[in-house]
């Protein structure tokens, strides 16, 4: 063998150029390489001889093709550098998971991903992982250690290698020596086949050299089979002793020797098994596997293994198959050894670095190609399969070496991992392999045919270069995927082949192998079963292979026995640690292996889900995508060998560069794949996606995560494998795109999207790869279009199918660390605490949180809820958190992320409902929104989220999330939804995100889970959010359940919240939706959702939990809640949570919004249109106004405030008009004022929806009553304004501020709803007329005059007037409530009269303007969808901000406690937060109780403030129906309101209390909320008047 290897080395050197063309002829020879002397026919003959002769032609091939193969190997090495860890880890994960079990997989994954060649060298015991790592690790080490050299060599040899890859593959296949010769050769770059090194491999030197170079390789062989290396050598040497040794001698100089030595080392490991098999089989194996060392010894065996798996008895067929059974260990060891050999070879030679890179890329390419190669080899012909499979695997040795170890476990996963990874490329690859297998031309064959002029050589070689480019990253995923398949096949199929080591001649093996491998590839579970069975049933070979497999997987004995260089204890002891070291080079992905480990632990099948996330890492995913797409493009034509050859030749010409045509093809493939994914998502082919996608998911995801997250996962090898590095994972930034893929793929929400995609795409693998990477990463930067859709479906499918919730977790988060990272990242998108029920989880699934998110998504996959425990743990703890927040987090992710998988276990019903509505849209949007939202959270919580989104979400996610995440769509850029927050967040399913079923289920699951998970994970105070989450069930109902969930959803799950907001803003569910948000924010309060007063009281009482949650969630609603909640309160009252929700939201607003207010106020000083800044600026401005007001800047601040607030008012009037319109439904029932406003909006909304008649009547009556009421209120308001002339402007500003706050979460609302706001302004003027007493003035009263007037009557605080106003507000808002309740008519009138007296002229005129604006707004209500959209966006932005901030209530409280005293004093009396406006109006009405409505009516004459308001709101202030009819609702006794509407008084109290923190300057409610409420209170006062007018008329 040595001589043959030397010969091959020499020949490779000499024949490098020779075999470039020969590679074309070589594949044809490969079919005939069964026993023909390969040497005799350099071209076709090379691949022909399987036995002794095979070596010489192989040698020639390696000489001629060796460099090319090494170039290819290097290309693959590069890929492996990118995807080595992936494949390695994936293999480890897959194999361990499938063959050994979750724990084993865990170790193996960690080791593989973690430890590259060093690991392989050091660990003989964990041969499988080491084998995989050997391939990956070696490649990785090549890439990392000798990156430049390996890369250079790869590039150098890439063209040659491409051509020669097939030749080398064939030759290598024929020459068993190549792996040995190639592995030993130190000159991975100089001579691909280093004769000296391979000589070491040859004979007994193989072991020493394996030890020296690839300890893992050799000690794999040694551990599992002491004579494995020797037997392989003997096998190689026996049949091809002279030639192979000669080749080996020749090879060392050649770079292919390194690759082939690697493969040979693997073959040595597997070669022992081969030795156990038969000489012919060994020849084949050596030809198929030993040649692999140049490319990837393991890949060659996978090819063989695939063949043998297909033809497990025919392990002999390619030797690769024979080697496959030992490959799981042997191939793994070989992989590691090969990699280490390559590394060792590479280390000596500067080229070796390059070669290593090249080999890594080559490994990647080969890994993919190995899938193809194995398929191709199987397809091609027995001889050709031997040569081709061996040759392809050899060519793909770097790539396929891992592929082989992974193939046995991953043949099952191949369908999953490969699908996932080949989603773009591997989808076609998978399809093509299946087709090719069926047609007899495997992917490898196609590749070889394409690449090599000859059937296999041409296909393979060009493909190797192109795949090297394309699959460099893809290859790791695909390679892992293929490797996973190979490994599955190896244990299953190769084990069987090993069982029949004597399985007859390579040709026979080859013949059967195609058949059996075909089924295995086609049936990944069969492959897995075979792998399991074969791994177990391999008695003689299994001794070595079992030892190797156990060692490889568990790294049991040999690892500790041979932990030479890396860190023998760690590498030996912990496969995880082994994975860690490789992480350096390509260990970014390897993280996913630890995730897989966690997954494995959590779920029996950690294999399938893990791969998707690991595979679908951002870099890997993108590259994978390109490669896969290129490969797909090639594969589709690849079925036709000539076409494939031509295509691949083209690409071979551009080794590292994809032809424009190829890129176009890839893009086309991506587009088609995306379409397929979307179609599949739509079709919701969850069973296909589940079955086909679940295993492949694991491989790609695991590989990607392993590579990306492997290091951090490895930080805590034992115990906290994932946690250790998961939180501070670097890949987080990188992971988010892949996190999205993995997130999506991993998270069931992503699988939801991906699932429909799965059927269209290769139902199994493409769904994850194409869906998650292609569909999910659009947002994740991987899939522009279906970022969060694809992966989730895949993962969801996986979980549904395998119930691999843990698997999906591992997919998103391989280890706990990664899981946490994924969850963290995914949940970062939707901050676990605040945005727990936001798609943010999904967004970040692909990264650190990808694991958690992936499980969340997987949870979304309904089927995977159980496995969500592992996911949940990712964010907080490995398993503990997952199980803790598995329900809330998982479910939340479940719900929030599109749960495409109908098989989602607990949330299936809701998920299915949502799935229909929100599956793909929600996935994409959720991922987008969550990703966006969580990205800010990532900044805040980079630790947890960094790892996750590197999911996303791929992973979160992100496949996560891909996975969130998916999901880093909504939450990450959540704050940036200024004008288009809705589009950003709800880009796809904006309207579809409001399906009641989806939100119904989602809110509960999402909110609770998000609150639990996010709060626990991300926040120090998760309980309160959790409470809200728990009560989020209300979110389920768009109007009422959603109120809790909806409000919570905005920040928690923007989509849900947005839909609710949109519903609230839209005519359909204007108030309920927004109320949902409010309630959702006050979900804990929402328990007493039924009685608004109770709820308010509860809200107030529950301030700690509910108010804090509100402070968290309601902060975003704060602006909208101040205004919107007031408007929403009437509707909220019907939901029976409006008051509490508002108060809670108000309080929350004070906390969260205060921070944002000041922050954003400074940032946004004049940018009122910024949705995220809406609340911040309005609140900040209101706070400034409030502070200045409180600071006796009565007119000074109003002047300043008037200017600023004038802008704000104009903007807010627009946004508030829309906000109010949507909220009016809430307001209608909450307060007469709010009810009036809400009634009008509700009317408009009902005009759209069903409630149009009564709300319209209410609005009409309100407008009618608002005429007189408006006169009174105007007078009152004008009085207040006259008191503070700028107060009129301030009132405008307050209205604007209220509106702005209301739309703070709806940044776009303001701009979009300017027209609607005009209408709303008029409407509000009408409402103000109705609520004339307090509405304009309270908002102006936010100005010190109005506020002080109110305070004067109420409480002697800083704002004396505001205090009386607050008292009046407490008394009067109940009057509007009574109006709403029918008891408030007199009260409203009386209160309105008094308030109107106070705010007579200016307020009345302002109210008139508001009425006009409301009238316009009524018109615009038809256009309410725009405003609804904006409001939803604004609310979502607010919630997103809250979620990002996380310390919403704390911030709130910090922000406004000083103003709270006034408000808190009145807060108890204060009505619901909705009453903030309503209270403002009633308070302002009651502020001057002596002022009768008549006086207020005259006060309305005051045009100063009215002129100002009209000037401010001139747009909105078109001629409105401002008939100031005496406010009938106002006449009702003002005192009764508080007692008569106990719900409202309670609500006002809660609201006031909430508002107290928010606007202390306002009346009770307005005091704390005064900062946010100056305008908001204006709006609320107006709304109260409106609501009072409308509701007093509607209700009375």
Curated annotation (Swiss-Prot):
SMART domains per UniProt: AT_hook (SM00384)
Effect of mutating residue 870 to S: In SGMFS, ACML, MDS and AML; somatic mutation in ACML and other myeloid malignancies; results in higher protein levels; cells expressing this mutant exhibit higher proliferation rates than those expressing the wild-type protein
Repeat positions for Sequence: 1520-1527, 1528-1535, 1536-1543
Record PTM N6-acetyllysine, positions in chain: 817
Region (Disordered): 1-83, 134-426, 475-518, 604-624, 722-763, 777-796, 854-889, 1134-1164, 1202-1225, 1245-1300, 1325-1344, 1440-1473, 1518-1596
3 X 8 AA tandem repeats of P-P-L-P-P-P-P-P: annotated span: 1520-1543
Ranges annotated as biased composition (Basic and acidic residues): 64-81, 363-372
Subcellular localization(s) per the UniProt record: Nucleus
Result, substituting residue 868 to Y: In myeloid malignancies
Tissue: Expressed in numerous tissues. Expressed at low levels in myeloid and monocytic cells as well as in CD34+ cells; expression levels are higher in myeloid malignancies.
A single GO cellular-component term on record: nuclear body
GO MF, one example: histone H3K4 methyltransferase activity
GO biological process: regulation of DNA-templated transcription
Biased composition (Pro residues): 1520-1546, 1560-1572
Biased composition (Low complexity): 164-175, 290-306
UniProt biased composition (Polar residues): 1-12, 213-236, 270-282, 375-395, 779-796, 854-880
Disulfide bond annotation, renumbered to this chain: none
Documented effect of changing residue 869 to N: In MDS and myeloid malignancies
Quaternary context: Interacts with SET.
Name of the protein in question: SET-binding protein
Species in which this protein is naturally found: Homo sapiens
Organism placement in taxonomy: Eukaryota, Metazoa, Chordata, Craniata, Vertebrata
Gene (UniProt): SETBP1
């Amino acid at each position: 063998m040595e001589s043959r290897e030397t010969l091959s080395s020499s020949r490779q050197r000499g024949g490098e150029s020779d075999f470039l063309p020969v590679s074309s002829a070589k594949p044809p020879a490969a079919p005939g390489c069964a026993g023909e002397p390969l040497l005799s026919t350099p071209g076709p003959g090379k691949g022909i001889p399987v036995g002794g002769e095979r070596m010489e032609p192989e040698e020639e091939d390696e000489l001629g093709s060796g460099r090319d193969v090494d170039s290819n190997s290097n290309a693959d090495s590069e890929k492996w550098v990118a995807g080595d860890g992936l494949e390695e880890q994936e293999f480890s994960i897959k194999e361990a998971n499938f063959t050994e079990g979750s724990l084993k997989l865990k170790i193996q994954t960690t080791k593989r991903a973690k430890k590259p060649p060093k690991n392989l060298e050091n660990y003989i015991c964990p041969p499988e992982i080491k084998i995989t790592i050997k391939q990956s690790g070696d490649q990785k080490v090549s890439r990392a250690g000798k990156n430049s050299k390996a890369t250079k060599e790869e590039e150098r040899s890439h063209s040659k290698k491409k051509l020669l890859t097939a030749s080398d593959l064939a030759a290598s296949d024929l020459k068993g020596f190549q792996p040995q010769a190639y592995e030993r050769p130190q000159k991975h770059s100089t001579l691909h086949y280093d004769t000296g090194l391979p000589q070491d491999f040859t004979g007994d030197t193989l072991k020493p050299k394996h030890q020296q170079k690839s300890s893992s390789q050799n000690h794999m062989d040694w551990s599992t089979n002491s004579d494995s290396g020797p037997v392989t050598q003997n096998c190689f040497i026996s049949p091809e002793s002279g030639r192979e040794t000669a080749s080996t001698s020749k090879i060392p100089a050649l770079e292919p020797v390194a690759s082939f030595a690697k493969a040979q080392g693997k073959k040595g490991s597997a070669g022992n098994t081969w030795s156990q098999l038969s000489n012919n089989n060994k020849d084949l194996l050596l030809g198929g596997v030993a040649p692999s060392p140049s490319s990837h010894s393991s890949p060659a065996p996978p090819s063989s293994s695939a063949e043998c798996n297909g033809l497990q008895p025919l392990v002999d067929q390619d030797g690769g198959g024979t080697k496959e059974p030992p490959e799981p260990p042997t191939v793994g060891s070989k992989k590691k050894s090969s990699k280490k050999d390559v590394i060792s070879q590479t280390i000596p030679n500067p080229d070796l670095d390059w070669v290593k890179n090249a080999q890594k890329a080559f490994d990647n390419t080969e890994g993919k190609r190995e899938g193809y190669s194995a398929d191709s080899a199987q397809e091609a012909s027995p001889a050709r399969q031997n040569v081709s499979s061996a040759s392809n695997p050899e060519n793909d040795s770097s790539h396929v070496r891992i592929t082989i170890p992974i193939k046995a476990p991953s043949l099952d996963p191949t369908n999953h991992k490969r699908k996932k990874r080949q989603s773009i490329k591997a989808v076609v690859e998978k399809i093509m392999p299946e087709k090719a297998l069926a047609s007899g031309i495997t992917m490898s064959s196609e590749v070889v045919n394409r690449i090599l002029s000859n059937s296999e050589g041409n296909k393979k070689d060009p493909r190797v270069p192109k795949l090297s480019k394309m699959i460099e990253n893809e290859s790791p995923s695909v390679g892992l995927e293929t490797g996973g398949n190979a490994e599955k096949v190896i244990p299953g199929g190769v084990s069987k082949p090993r069982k029949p080591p004597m399985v007859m001649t390579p040709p026979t093996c080859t013949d059967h192998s195609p058949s059996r491998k075909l089924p295995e590839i086609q049936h990944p579970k069969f492959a897995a079963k075979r792998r399991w069975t074969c791994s177990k049933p391999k008695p003689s070979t299994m001794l070595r292979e079992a030892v190797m497999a156990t060692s490889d997987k568990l790294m049991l004995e040999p690892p500790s026995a041979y932990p030479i260089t890396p860190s023998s204890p760690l590498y030996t002891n912990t496969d995880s640690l082994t994975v860690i070291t490789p992480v350096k080079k390509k260990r970014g992905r390897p993280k996913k292996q630890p995730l897989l480990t966690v997954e494995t632990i959590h779920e029996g099948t950690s294999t399938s889900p893990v791969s998707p996330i690991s595979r679908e890492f951002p870099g890997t995913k993108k590259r994978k995508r390109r490669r896969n797409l290129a490969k797909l493009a090639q594969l589709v034509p690849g079925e036709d060998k000539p076409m494939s050859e031509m295509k691949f030749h083209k690409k071979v010409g551009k080794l590292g560069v994809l032809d424009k045509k190829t890129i176009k093809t890839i893009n086309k493939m991506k587009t088609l794949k995306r379409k397929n994914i979307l179609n599949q998502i739509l079709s919701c082919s969850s069973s296909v996606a589940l079955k086909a996608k679940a295993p492949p998911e694991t491989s790609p995801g695991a590989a990607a995560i392993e590579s990306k997250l492997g290091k951090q996962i490895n930080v805590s090898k034992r115990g906290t494998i994932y946690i250790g590095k998961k939180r501070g994972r670097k890949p987080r930034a990188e992971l988010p795109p892949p996190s999205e893929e993995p997130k999506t793929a991993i998270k069931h929400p992503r699988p939801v999207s991906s699932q429909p995609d799965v059927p269209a795409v290769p139902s199994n693998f493409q769904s994850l790869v194409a869906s998650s990477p292609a569909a999910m990463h659009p947002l994740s930067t991987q899939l522009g279009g279906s970022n969060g859709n694809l992966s989730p479906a895949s993962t969801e499918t996986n979980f549904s199918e395998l119930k691999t919730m843990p698997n999906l977790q591992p997919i998103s988060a391989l280890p706990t660390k990664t899981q946490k990272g994924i969850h963290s990242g995914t949940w970062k998108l939707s901050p676990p605490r605040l945005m727990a029920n936001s798609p943010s989880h999904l967004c970040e699934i692909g990264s650190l949180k990808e694991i958690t998110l992936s499980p969340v998504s997987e949870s979304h996959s309904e089927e995977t809820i159980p496995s969500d425990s592992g996911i949940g743990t990712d964010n907080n703890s490995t398993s503990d958190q997952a199980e803790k927040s598995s329900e809330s987090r998982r479910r939340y992710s479940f719900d929030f992320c599109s749960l495409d998988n109908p098989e989602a276990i607990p949330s299936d019903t809701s998920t299915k409902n949502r799935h229909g509505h929100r599956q793909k849209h929600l996935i994409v949007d959720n991922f987008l929104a969550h990703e966006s939202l969580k990205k800010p959270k990532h900044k805040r919580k980079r630790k947890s989220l960094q790892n996750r989104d590197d999911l996303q979400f791929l992973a979160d996610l992100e496949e996560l999330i891909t996975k969130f995440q998916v999901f880093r769509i909504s939450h990450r850029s959540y704050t940036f939804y200024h004008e288009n927050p809705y589009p950003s967040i709800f880009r796809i399913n904006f309207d579809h995100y409001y399906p009641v079923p989806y939100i119904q289920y989602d809110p509960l699951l999402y909110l609770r889970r998000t609150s639990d998970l996010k709060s626990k994970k991300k926040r120090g105070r998760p309980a309160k959010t959790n409470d809200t989450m728990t009560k989020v069930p209300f979110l389920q109902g768009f109007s009422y359940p959603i109120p809790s969930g909806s409000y919570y959803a905005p920040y928690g799950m923007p989509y849900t919240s947005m839909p609710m907001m949109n519903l609230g803003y839209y005519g359909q569910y204007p108030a309920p939706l927004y109320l949902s948000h409010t309630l959702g924010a006050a979900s804990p309060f929402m328990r007493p959702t039924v009685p608004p007063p109770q709820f308010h009281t509860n809200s107030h009482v529950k301030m700690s939990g509910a108010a804090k949650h509100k402070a968290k969630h309601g902060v975003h609603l704060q602006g909208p809640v101040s205004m919107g909640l007031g408007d929403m309160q009437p509707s909220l009252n019907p939901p029976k949570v409006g008051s509490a929700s508002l108060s809670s939201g108000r309080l929350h607003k004070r906390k969260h919004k205060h921070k944002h207010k000041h922050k954003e106020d400074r940032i946004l000083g004049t940018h009122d249109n910024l949705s995220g800044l809406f609340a911040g600026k309005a609140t900040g401005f209101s706070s400034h106004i409030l502070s200045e007001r409180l600071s006796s800047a009565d007119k000074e601040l109003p002047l300043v405030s008037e200017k600023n607030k004038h802008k704000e008012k104009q903007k807010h009037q627009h946004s508030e008009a829309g906000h109010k319109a949507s909220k009016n439904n809430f307001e209608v029932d909450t307060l007469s004022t709010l009810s009036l406003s809400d009634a009008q909006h509700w009317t408009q909304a009902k005009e759209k929806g069903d409630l149009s008649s009564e709300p319209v009547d209410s609005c009409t009556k309100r407008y009618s009553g608002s005429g007189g009421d408006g006169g009174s209120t105007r007078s009152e308001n004008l009085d207040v304004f006259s008191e503070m002339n700028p107060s009129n402007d301030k009132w405008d500003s307050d209205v604007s501020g209220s509106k702005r706050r209301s739309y703070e979460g709806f940044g776009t609302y303001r701009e979009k709803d300017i027209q609607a706001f005009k209408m709303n302004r008029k409407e509000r003027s009408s409402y103000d007329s109705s609520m004339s007493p307090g509405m304009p003035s309270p908002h102006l009263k936010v100005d010190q005059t109005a506020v002080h007037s109110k305070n004067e009557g109420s409480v002697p605080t800083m704002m004396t007037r505001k205090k009386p106003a607050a008292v009046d507000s407490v008394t009067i808002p109940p009057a509007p409530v009574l109006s709403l309740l029918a008891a408030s008519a007199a009260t409203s009138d009386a209160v309105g009269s008094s308030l109107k007296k106070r705010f007579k002229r200016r307020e009345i005129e302002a109210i008139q303007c508001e009425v006009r604006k409301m009238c316009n707004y009524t018109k615009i209500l038809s256009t309410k969808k725009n405003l609804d959209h904006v409001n939803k966006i604004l609310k979502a932005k607010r919630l997103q901000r809250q979620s990002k901030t996380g310390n919403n209530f704390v911030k709130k409280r910090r922000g406004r406690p000083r103003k709270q005293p006034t408000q808190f004093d009145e807060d108890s009396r204060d009505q619901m937060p909705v009453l903030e406006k309503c209270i403002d109006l009633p308070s302002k009405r009651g502020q001057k109780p002596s002022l009768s409505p008549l006086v207020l009516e005259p006060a309305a004459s005051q045009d100063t403030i009215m002129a100002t308001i009209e000037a401010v709101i001139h747009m909105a202030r078109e001629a409105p129906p401002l008939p100031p009819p005496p406010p009938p609702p106002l006449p009702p006794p003002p005192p009764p309101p508080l007692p008569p509407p106990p719900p409202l008084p309670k609500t006002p109290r809660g609201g006031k209390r909430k508002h107290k923190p928010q606007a202390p300057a306002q009346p009770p409610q307005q005091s704390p909320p005064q900062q946010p409420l100056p305008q908001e209170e204006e709006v609320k006062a107006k709304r109260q008047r409106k609501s009072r007018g409308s509701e007093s008329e509607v209700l009375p």
